[in-house]
Amino acid sequence: MRGERGSKPSVYSLFFDGVLTRTDPERAHHGAFRAIRAARPVLASRRTPGEQVTALGLTFPNVLGLAAGFDKNAVGIDALAALGFGHVEIGTVTGEPQPGNPKPRLFRLPEDRAIVNRMGFNNDGAEVVARRLAERSRGRDRLGHRSRPVLGVNIGKSKVVPDDDQAAVEADYEKSARLLAPYADYLVVNVSSPNTPGLRNLQAVEKLRPLLEHVRRTADAVTRTRVPLLVKIAPDLADEDVLGVADLALAIGLDGIIATNTTISRAGLRTPADRVGEIGAGGLSGRPLTGRALEVLRLLRERVGPDLTLVGVGGISTVQDARDRLTAGADLLQAYSAFVYEGPLWPRRIVRGVA
């Protein structure tokens, strides 16, 4: 939380250590997000930093995006972009609205600069989010064309849908794709969150292939311009399964892979074991994920060559982390946990550092 590791603490770092660490993490998230949205009129005048990147057939203002999970319901896209993110990925959005798992469900591990979450895809549902995106689109049309962030829409399985009913799973993702693809610059199929029972089973190639093909057909049916489709995978996949997903992506003409989601591993943490045990289940994000996320990215790039867009995410905290991910083959980067720990100036610092 010191910007680059070992540098002087920032004002935000001191505030985080002194105040936010004593506040319930989910409450702090909502408070910070409200503040960001309120500051949008001031932030909107700032030029987006960094150099443009072409990927997925799209022009991104810069290489760094905000990963799904921060803005689940598409309520602060443009305010977040004004902080310096070149793309914002909303969601995960499910076909049906759902409250998510019982609270508490979000935990900080400050010693590891990590977060554990078991949110459970709490969101307003595809119908409500689609209406919100439609309203945003109409508002932008009224104001005339202006520079904007690239918008990713991340869709996942509703908890009420059994993972062993392939037809029901496909119908659930179809609903989200049908409603949301018209507003997405790119679409992401999330099959890798550990917080929806059975979801990760859908990463098996025999289940993943028909699902991705079904979402592709659905998106094509409701859009005039082809919307790029990506899949987000877990760091906990065995290497051979990572390669299997890579081969599948090439075989069916997927546009890209996001690597990686959170991990269920707790290996190598500095946080005391009793505290980790007390927190319990959930996906771990942040600095401990850096090594494995980098490994998965390298595996993917070696397998797919230049043919797919790869988005590197997981444990990117410093400019050097970002450079390492780009060197390993990432076309784009995403972050979440470091943004929470480092504060609103962090995106611009990373973008300028890799430019």
From Swiss-Prot:
Pfam families according to UniProt: DHO_dh
EC numbers on record: 1.3.5.2
Cofactor: FMN
SUPFAM superfamilies: FMN-linked oxidoreductases
Binding site for FMN: A68, G69, F70, D71, K72, T92, N154, N190, K232, T260, G286, G315, Y336, S337
Assembly with partners or alone: Monomer.
Family from the record: Belongs to the dihydroorotate dehydrogenase family. Type 2 subfamily.
Function: Catalyzes the conversion of dihydroorotate to orotate with quinone as electron acceptor.
Protein name: Dihydroorotate dehydrogenase (quinone)
Biological source species: Nocardioides sp. (strain ATCC BAA-499 / JS614)
Chain's gene name: pyrD
